[in-house]
Amino acid sequence: MDSREIVERTITYTAPARLAATLPEPYWNDLVHVNYDLPGFERAWREVRPGRQEYVDEWGNTWARVDRTSKGEVSRGVLESWERLETLTLPDLAHPAHFQRVRAVCAQRDETRFRVGGLPGFPFNVARKMRRLDQFLMDLLLAPDQVAALLRRVEDLLAEVIVQYAEAGVDGVMFPEDWGTQLSLMIHPDMWREVFKPGFSRLCAVAHDRGVKVLMHSCGKITAIIPDLVEVGIDVLQFDQPQLHGIDILAQFHGQMTFWCPVDIQKTLQTQDERQIEAEAQELVEKLGGPDGGFIAGYYGDNPSIGLEPHWQYVACRAFVRYGDYARAAV
């Protein structure tokens, strides 16, 4: 059973041979990420003054950061005024020529990992940057018609991108969409259902109709809409803070949703206690996964930003491997 089949069986709850994982060497990584190219665009940070870097993204948004490791945040959106909406030009992400490298990776016979095409987000993650998050959240109440028009344009573009990925041969598409704070969803769940859920349903259907799985990353406590995400067709939820939801709460979705998590980066890893880290790794495997599937073990890729030496995640990796040997566990 190769990596692709292990991930597929994990997502569909059809008995993978072992734990699916995205761990660094000397362990295993069952996923390979492939992305479209944008000729002429380079994400290059430039120093605008001491201690501040900026770059302009493919949408026209200006990003800023005050360190050298984080992804930064939008400081000026391309759509500062709704008067520009009708003339706003979106990048041609879905041009077939941009997927040549994706097609090449998917055509490699020796590439046996689960192939995941990257999306810039679903409509919220794209639109909120064009207006800046603070303004966009106000727009939901103050300019609902303009918000709906912008979301639809972005949704149409993303649907085309998903089609191109499917035709290139990917197994899944993945998008980031940070919907939560430490306490709850950023907006009332009913508003999310009214404004955003239809777009989720449509884009998941575009993927599923072409045999492509949908993977979503989100930070924050979005527990209130997990049942909705199951309903619309999200196949995998990638959480870096599983303790924020409660592992026992997530376990209630066993059989309906696959979770992909490292040991909690905010709480458990920060203890730098090997016993606690190992115990959570075991709990994640046994409560969210197991021999029938449902869990992918993760590794947070930016140790400097969480203030930890790699050692502490390697403690988690060893525990994931130990408890993810389903054949041995069955003996």
Residue ranges of model-derived segments:
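Short aromatic-enriched loop/helix-cap "lid" or pocket-rim segments at secondary-structure transitions
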Residues: 32-36, 67-69, 129, 309-312
